[in-house]
Amino acid sequence: MSSLQIDPDEVFYPSLPSGRPDTLPAYKIFRYPSTQLTVPVFQAHWAKGTPLLIEGVLENFEIEWTPDYFIREYGTQSCIVVECQTETNKRVTVGDFFRQFGRYDNRQPVGSSGDNADGGGGGSGLGPGTWKLKDWPPSTDFKAAFPELYDDFSQAVPIPSYVRRDGTLNIASHFPKNTVAPDLGPKMYNAMASSDQKGSKGSTRLHMDMADALNIMTYAANAPDGSPGCAAWDLFRCEDSDKLRTFLKERFRNIFQHDPIHSQQVYLDYELRKELWEKYQVRSYRVYQRPGEAIFIPAGVAHQVVNLADCIKVAIDFRTKSEQGLEGRRVAVAVYDVVCVVILFPAGGAAAEATVKGPPQC
């Protein structure tokens, strides 16, 4: 591990989009241009178990990951989209979904009957609501489904020795060949604009991953008000996880069968984040991600996302040996049956396989 010291006077990420005052306390995230993120710099940050933002990643891509590209190349493919508020789903084509990006005029909230014959979906068949195409492709390996995108993504990621499937410092790349390896991605996360106001379920509800992750935004339409599009992230420190769980159990009694974070049932809107701060002094890294920006999320960091515009993102999981948030911890994983969960814990650099039975204790 590098002994490189992090300069406390470094420029932090200028998080607030124009016209969006945010009065809640938040941690500031370190940022680096893609060209300046070296392995020693990354290791110095990663040893602290804190998230990191990288700028200018889009310059490394050769393919334009935009709605037009996906309409042209995959528009006739069938896909399942999910409504962010209700979790209901429907089958449409990829083209139906992406043609709505940036078209806000006819959109209506879920539950609205709409004045238009198409139900508020602009002729797409989507109907009212905020729709997302997540974990795409859902079952097929990304490399097999989209070989050209896989190659483009692999050559564009920052710190490839850690992030790529075949990265020499990625423990997941050393998984035994004679076993079924976990699907660590890449996966795409495409969602329409949502809101972080009272009652919103966001775009991705609060959850925690057992693997490290890199999430890159490749495209954002302008927001409904015409401002540059972005997505708002809340990332919570590992050491605040127990307070976060206590708050969720107190605030949402009797809705969790298992761990309240891993259940992925709650989005902490502005009012809930305010209450969390006032009661427990827990704040998040509040980060506004824009096109070309990549966020590194350490394993064990609870996080949630709300798209403030229509956004396209691609993410991949990886494993390192220095996960401060997981060492010495029991990881709570919500399981409803006897499931073989592959957990790549850094025990002497070897992969470990654990069988989890029943809902674990926090």
Predicted regions: what they are:
Residues 54:
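Basic nucleic-acid-binding interfaces
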